[in-house]
Swiss-Prot record:
Its cofactor is Mg(2+). It catalyses: a ribonucleoside 5'-triphosphate + H2O = a ribonucleoside 5'-diphosphate + phosphate + H(+); a ribonucleoside 5'-diphosphate + H2O = a ribonucleoside 5'-phosphate + phosphate + H(+). Mg(2+) 1 binds at N87, D103, D107. InterPro entries: DUF402, FomD-like_sf, Ntdp-like, SA1684. This is Nucleoside triphosphate/diphosphate phosphatase.
Length: 175
């Protein structure tokens, strides 16, 4: 299987459990692309929502996708520090068209001091009923929230000191 090449521009597509498109991020530059991990960088890119709305991101960001974890992270570089937005969802797939995953509603926002907040539990509860998430998905997601919190506490993976900054330096080489 081919994986996105370093320096190439890719699209990121998130879907819902029922197969409908949720959100599309245009033009993320691949900084690392392997069977296990894809790391990308972007800045002020267009994001299209499933309801037709669209908007631009406000700051540079480093995205981290892991083929074994049910979450991905976006490290947003702001004047007052690095914020993370973490999406709970399936491990990524790559099919030459885009990097894809299924979004399962729950999110964790991490602040520069590494405190964090679990978000969208109400949306998850609603979609779990509406889209009939199987019990196994619920178990996987609860374990994944725990794993993600552990990574935050341990400063592991994308939360490691200088992770976002060093990948951002590489991103600047492609701009």
């Amino acid at each position: 299987m081919n994986f996105p090449k370093v320096g190439s521009k890719i699209q990121i597509q998130s879907y819902k459990h029922n197969g409908s498109i949720h959100r599309i991020w245009e033009e993320t530059i691949v900084l690392k692309g392997t069977s296990k991990v894809v790391i990308g960088g972007n800045d002020r890119i267009l994001v299209k929502e499933s309801d037709g709305r669209h908007w631009r991101t406000r700051e540079p960001a480093i995205c981290y996708f892991d083929s074994e974890q049910w979450f991905n992270t976006i490290g947003m570089i702001r004047a007052d520090g690095i914020y993370f937005y973490c999406n709970l969802g399936t491990p990524f797939t790559w099919d030459e068209e885009a990097l894809k995953y299924i979004d399962y509603d729950l999110d964790i926002k991490v602040f520069p001091d590494m405190t964090f907040k679990l978000l969208d539990e109400d949306e998850y509860a609603m979609h779990r009923k509406m889209m009939k998430y199987p019990p196994e998905i619920d178990r996987i997601l609860q374990r994944s929230v725990d794993e993600l919190v552990s990574w935050i506490h341990q400063r592991k993976g994308p939360f490691a000191p200088q992770f976002v900054e060093s990948w951002y330096e590489r991103f600047l080489q492609y701009r």
